[in-house]
């Protein structure tokens, strides 16, 4: 049985110039870093190394491009190296101690807020942007940058279902994010990024600001999502990375309340049944319910008490 692969930063954090990926000038050094032979590298450069399928578990179906085992190992290795490079404070995704909730909390307050995301972010980050990152930002030789960009992309773009997707999408688009950050900071506007979700809050967040953000994004060959871009007025509630943000605190979304209480009612109806099948089903519902309640407990402490009572429940 294969051991599960995971990103390992070894608790390291350093500048881009101190990365093991910096200034790789020969194929031999690249092969050594990735622990690959010439033949293995050659076999991994085709798009046939991905399992491609449709994920229908969400409201909107998503095309998933997941690397097969050998390529997944290489992606995990490169992702581990990329995740050791320090990222700006405005990034809240893929960083220990940060989350969608720290991203949302940053914007608590009455100020006008702009929420948006980049349409089809991974698919719209093309191989030439990945090549530019390895060649210009990491100062690799052109042939090494070409190999790395081919290893890290599927059908000419960043894959949608790899461990490398999130960190590489940031670095390949760092110029765009940094330009947006500079533009915001000059106007005393707070900006945060969670993968492809970008949020701005401040007194100078206006329609003109929104239009200029749109221009910057388009300048870097991306599209501001037309239906997911909202300009929130002063003192209004806004949904930021899954949490409702008010003037003084985070709140739980109504749909999350409804989902929790629907499953809680279902669990309470069947929790005392004794058949084997019902016990398995009850445990599944209980675990799913606890997962949802624990998640919302990060926003509202009252849910932590509810989770404890469910976890400690014993049949009469």
PLM features: residue spans?
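Right-hand nucleic-acid polymerase module
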Residues: 1-56, 61-162, 171-178, 182, ...
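Catalytic palm active-site di-aspartate
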Residues: 115-119, 161, 165, 186-202
């Amino acid at each position: 049985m294969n051991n599960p692969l995971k990103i390992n930063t070894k608790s390291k954090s350093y500048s881009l110039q101190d990365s093991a990926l910096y200034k790789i000038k020969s194929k031999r050094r690249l092969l050594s870093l990735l622990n690959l032979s010439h033949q293995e590298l050659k076999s991994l450069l085709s798009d046939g190394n991905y399992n491609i399928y449709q994920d229908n578990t969400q409201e909107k179906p998503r095309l998933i491009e997941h690397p097969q085992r050998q390529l997944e190992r290489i992606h995990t290795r490169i992702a581990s190296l990329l995740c050791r490079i320090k990222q700006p404070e405005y990034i809240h995704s893929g960083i220990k101690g940060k989350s969608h909730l720290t991203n949302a909390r940053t914007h608590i307050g009455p100020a006008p807020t702009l929420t948006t995301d980049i349409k089809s972010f991974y698919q719209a980050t093309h191989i030439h942007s990945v090549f530019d990152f390895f060649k210009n930002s990491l100062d690799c030789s052109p042939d090494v940058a070409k190999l790395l960009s081919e290893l890290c992309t599927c059908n000419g773009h960043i894959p949608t279902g790899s461990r490398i997707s999130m960190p590489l999408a940031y670095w390949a688009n760092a110029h765009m994010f940094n330009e947006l950050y500079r533009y915001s900071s000059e106007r005393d506007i707070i900006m945060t990024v969670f993968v492809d979700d970008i949020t701005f809050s401040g007194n100078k967040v206006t329609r003109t600001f929104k239009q200029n953000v749109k221009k910057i994004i388009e300048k870097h060959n991306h599209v501001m999502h037309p239906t997911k871009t909202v300009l929130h007025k002063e003192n209004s509630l806004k949904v930021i990375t899954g949490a409702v943000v008010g003037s003084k605190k985070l709140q739980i979304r109504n749909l999350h309340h409804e989902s929790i209480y629907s499953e809680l009612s279902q669990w309470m109806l069947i929790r005392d049944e004794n058949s084997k099948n019902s016990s398995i089903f009850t445990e599944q519902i209980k675990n799913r319910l606890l997962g949802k309640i624990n998640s919302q407990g990060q926003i509202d402490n009252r849910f932590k008490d509810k989770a404890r009572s469910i976890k400690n429940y014993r049949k009469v």
